[in-house]
Amino acid sequence: MQDNFPNIVSKIRELYGEGFIPLHAPYFGGNEKKYLADCIDSTFVSSVGQYVNLFEQKLAEFTGAKYAIATVNGTSALHVSLILAGVEANDEVLTQALTFVATSNAISYIGASPVFIDVDRDTMGLSPEKLENFFKNETVMNTDGFCYNKSTGKRIKACVPMHTFGIPLRISEVVSICKKHNIIVVEDTAESLGSYVNNIHTGNFGQLAAFSFNGNKTITCGGGGAIITNDETLAKRAKHLTTTAKSPHPFEFFHDEIGFNYRMPNLNAAVACAQLEQLDLFLKNKRITAEKYSTFFKEIGVDFVNEITNTKANYWLNAIILKNKEERDSFISYTNEHEIMTRPIWTLMNRLPAFKNAQTDDLINSYWLEERVVNIPSSYRQ
């Protein structure tokens, strides 16, 4: 494989040119400056303004969801989604160990505990088979109608599967399994804006979903996140909680519960609106890049992570799977030495100090992927 390292570098440079090549750089080729100037001129630069409302409307239209609530980042969207799902302190939430730390952090903010379930190798997302096995062997339904962990005695309230790198997981199966056990599904769609399963946008399968618009995402507004849902009651409470739980009144300040200052500022929303206008262009461009990568890596015998049947990925971050950790590390060192940014997948959550005592299943696929997956440059190509 090391003999192919120069060829891979040449291919990436063929796509992205000379000089330093980042992993995923933002592209501002639309109305970003115009909308920002308009926002500044309006003086409405904080969490009240026309662009916040417009972005929510346009995001809902794009995803096909009935409601979208803009937040300051993806982690805040996850945090509030879990509260809306009814997760409380001392509950447990099923999720994957192979994820970005925000997923587990959001669970911990509530005082709940993550339980880590394995992923499928082909999607890198939560495995329906492993999830079913966990319910069968490790849980019991109580007379109160809730599912409990036999080992800990704690209530399992929610499940957070993530569409890793924008590759849709087998979400219909996950939702079906969770429904049998009275578990609410919150989709972590931080990376999957523009990804579909059977022509339905990711995020519309669970009761709630959380998006991220961080600087390295398919569209960005510097930070930013959003909750989508098709439940009007959840949507209204999401907006209420993210605006400090303030009761509507022309001048009085009355807050009827503990809320959060999580509303997306109008400045960020102005950029987000301009980015969303270009999303179709971004997705088309990234799909062409992924197809070129897929063809090239197939020719040299390297596994490229592709979407599975009946799904459409946004190919946010393209990924390859190498033979072992040694080959992975050699490749990452070689490419970065040649000014091409590549990176390994995240350290598994159960290896981190904060979650080292969390319950897990065997995580066979997660450990296997952790040692082999490498992300390669995936920016919009001009």
What name fits each language-model region?
Residues M1-V45, P377:
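N-terminal "arm"/small-domain region of PLP-dependent enzymes with the aminotransferase-like
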Residues K11, N53-Q57, A65-K66, D118, ...:
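PLP-dependent aminotransferase class I/II
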Residues V45-E92, L98, A106-S108, F116-D118, ...:
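Phosphate-binding glycine-rich loop
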Residues N105-I107, I177, H201, L267:
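Hydrophobic/aromatic ligand-binding patch that stacks against planar heteroaromatic rings
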Residues G111:
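Structured binding elements
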Residues D122-C221, A226-I228, T233, N375:
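Active-site phosphate-binding strand-loop segment of PLP-dependent enzymes
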